[in-house]
Amino acid sequence: MDIRPLAIPGSFVVTPKIHGDDRGEFVEWFRADLLKKATGLDFSVAQANLSVSAKGTLRGIHFADVPPGQAKYVMCSSGSIEDYVVDIRVGSPTFGAWDRAIISASERNAIVLDVGLGHAFLALEDNTTVTYLVTDQFKPHAEHAINPLDEDLGLKFALPARELLLSEKDTSAPGFLAAQAAGLLPTWQG
């Protein structure tokens, strides 16, 4: 299992070893012990989620109140996504920066986000199925969003804006600076 950091502290891409033969494949896609050894993150799964998206679906930027926050381990069981990590932690050396990685069922790779990071993804294929392992249960009162099309963040997408499908929640979410001014963003704990 290869675990490499992204440009945002607390985010990583995990690429597992694929064991294949004439019968198919076997993949060990999550190992808490190896993740902790490589990243220092103590990832205790509290909930597993699954979403199925049409091509062009853009979900996020989502984040939870800290504490307790919600670390995520995100992989595709079918299709592919362009996955975004946004540093929304006030005081972080990379505050306001973002990074992305392609996560796909064919590569069996995953992205890991520590508590306090913003997360979004763009489905690159129809029927893209994303599986999330998270460290805290979903709590609607503690969940927030930032508009992923906010110009202050400047996220770049693999598809043109006219092809993006967003929920009403994400479309009406505040921009990055408005969320900061409202005191919604977590504080850097580094």
Enumerate the language-model features and the residues they cover.
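Short, conserved beta-strand edge motifs with alternating hydrophobic and charged residues
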Residues: 84, 112-114
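Ligand-binding loop in jelly-roll beta-barrel domains
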Residues: 108, 115-131
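Non-catalytic, conserved peripheral segments adjacent to functional cores
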Residues: 1-106, 125-127, 134-190
